[in-house]
Amino acid sequence: MTFEIVRYTADKATEWNAFVAQSKNGTFLFDRRYMDYHSDRFEDYSLMFYLQGRLYGLLPANRKGDELQSHMGLTYGGLVMDAKTTAALTVTLFRELNDYLREHGFHHVLYKCVPWIYHQMAAEEDLYAISQTCDARLAHRDLGITIIQRNAIRWERIRRRALKRAEEAGLTVERSNDYGGFWDVLNNNLEMKYGSKPVHTLQEIELLHTRFPENIVLYTAKKEDAILAGIVVYVSTQVVRAQYSSATPLGKQLGAIDIIYDRIINHDYHSFPYFEFGTSAVDHTAMINESLVFQKEGFGGRGICFDRYEWEL
């Protein structure tokens, strides 16, 4: 075999994290300090690929029965690569990965790729390889609404008016560590509207913030010290992503979300190439929440795809 394939173990965390940090398509979500916060929920089956003793790539993954899944605790996944990746070797890697998986009792693969906005240089060798080697087919496509800052679209009138309302009402925006206060707003909204809870508990998001204080950031909008809205952003090398956003009834009325987005998109992170509002699927289906997409498009966002592929072994 060309590649030595090694299953990740905790003693390799330093090597894993160092590769992620210098990769061309990795983000802090692939850092083991992030991935392992919910290690009890998944049977981790992440893999490391060595070429002549040098680490060539990483695959964040978990096992579910006879299926290898790009790690289901992460928004996106796929092969993490560096600048030395070549198309021919990546085709070989996936051919040998399939052999390895068959030997270890797998029959199916579910593969999430890293969306192109997170690529620091061209990084779609994996997509070419799975089409050539694995007979991969598209299993699911979600829509993420994104602003490309170099070609930013002016906010729609409805959003500009909401921003003006917030300014006239005297709302103040601040970078905050009051995750507890915002989680109360978020929990109440999700419970009332969807009968659900945030993916992260308060304790988990506070833990992750302490581990990644510059990558996980909370902004709140207040009036007289009362939190009317908040947005948690995930900050990677070139993408700022709205991971959570929520407002109280009064906050919605006064445009509290809009004034926070103005601060984040047009001021604090304006120099970042992309701002991503997150995906808008309805309960993990192929349907989109049209009203939510409409709101995001009002800020000048437009669609990119978050894809999952599958193949049989």
What are these regions (language model features)?
Residues 3-52, 56-67, 115-251:
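A conserved beta-strand-loop-helix scaffold within acyl/acetyltransferase catalytic domains
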Residues 50, 58-61, 80, 86-98, ...:
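Aromatic (often tryptophan-rich) hydrophobic motifs at membrane interfaces
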Residues 67-72, 292:
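Short, flexible, mixed-charge acidic loops at enzyme active sites
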Residues 72-76, 140, 304:
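Short, solvent-exposed loop/turn segments at the edges of secondary structure
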Residues 42-44, 103-106, 216, 270-272:
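Short, high-confidence coil segments that cap the C-terminus of an alpha-helix
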Residues 72-120:
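A gly/proline- and charged-residue-enriched helix-loop-helix capping module
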Residues 3, 107, 171, 272-273:
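A structural micro-motif
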